[in-house]
Design a protein with these regions (language model features):
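Conserved Rossmann-fold NAD(P)-dependent oxidoreductase catalytic core, especially the SDR/UDP-sugar
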Residues: 2-51, 56
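Strand-loop microenvironment adjacent to phosphate/nucleotide-handling motifs in alpha/beta enzyme folds
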Residues: 22, 52, 56-73, 78-253
Length: 253
């Protein structure tokens, strides 16, 4: 649901940030995502908007130090493909992959936690830190390796008597074949070679606050077209690849 995504990712971040300021929290770290870079769907656009909120608040005089850490998928975390593939293999398949060419960044939970904590200590205010995720992994290869590591054979045209079939379901609306971690190329090194500081464009609080006010009104009016328009206004690199996908929007239509 688009409105709940906006409420959670944008206004949820804003509420937490304002609470941190009012209670004197010293450091606030936002966990962002590679989907915030040149977003093609509402989720990615709202995550980039959340980054803009913290960048704008950092430009105001307050005692809370805001930092943003942007990275990709975390192996074994909730919603990760690993637990899904394990479950599908255990149930006899098929293992579902959206596209044979789709690739994604991955890191372990331990790596992610350590780098996020270190990034928080490096922040100077409004920083966007990008973690070195290594090479992107082909999801199709990951699925095949997991089937083989389970002691099973892939069922396909070359091996029709195999155990587990891989089913290609097609990219979902707004889904990319690959993700990026940087909007621009303006980065600088930090004390940790696996953490880069990215210089990203920001928006002044006065302008952003006006868009936030308009978002609230559009949510109350269930104006989904206006919501998309405002997201594009705040995040110019948001390039929706499809019509608005939302059950409530379709019902209102």
């Amino acid at each position: 649901n688009n409105t709940e995504g906006i409420n959670n990712n944008i206004f949820g971040t804003l509420n937490c940030a304002q609470a941190a300021i009012s209670t004197g929290v010293e450091t606030f770290v936002l966990i962002s995502t590679d989907k915030a870079v040149r977003p093609t769907n509402t989720m990615g656009a709202t995550k980039r908007f959340a980054e803009l909120v913290l960048q704008a608040l950092s430009s105001k005089n307050n005692n809370t130090l805001f930092s943003i850490v942007r990275f990709g998928n975390v192996l074994g975390s909730s919603g990760s493909v690993i637990p899904l593939f394990k479950k599908q293999i255990k149930n006899g398949g098929p293992v579902t992959v959206t596209d044979p060419n789709i690739i994604r960044y991955f890191m372990t939970i331990t790596e992610a936690v350590e780098l996020v904590i270190q990034s928080g200590s490096m922040g100077e205010g409004g920083d966007v830190f990008v973690l070195d995720m290594g090479e992107q992994v082909k999801i199709d290869d990951l699925a095949k390796k997991m089937i083989k590591l389970s002691g099973l054979q892939i069922k396909d045209d070359l091996n029709p008597d195999g155990d587990i079939e891989i089913k290609y379901t097609g990219l979902r609306p707004g889904e990319k074949l690959f993700e990026e971690l940087l909007i621009g190329k303006n980065t600088s090194e930090t004390d940790n070679p696996r953490i880069m500081r990215a210089k990203e464009e920001m928006m002044e609080w006065t302008k952003l606050e006006g868009i936030l006010d308009e978002l609230r009104i559009a949510i109350n009016e269930n104006n989904y077209l206006k919501l998309r328009e405002l997201l594009i206004q705040a995040v110019p690199l948001f390039k929706p690849q499809c019509d608005i996908i939302d059950i409530l929007y379709k019902k209102i239509e």
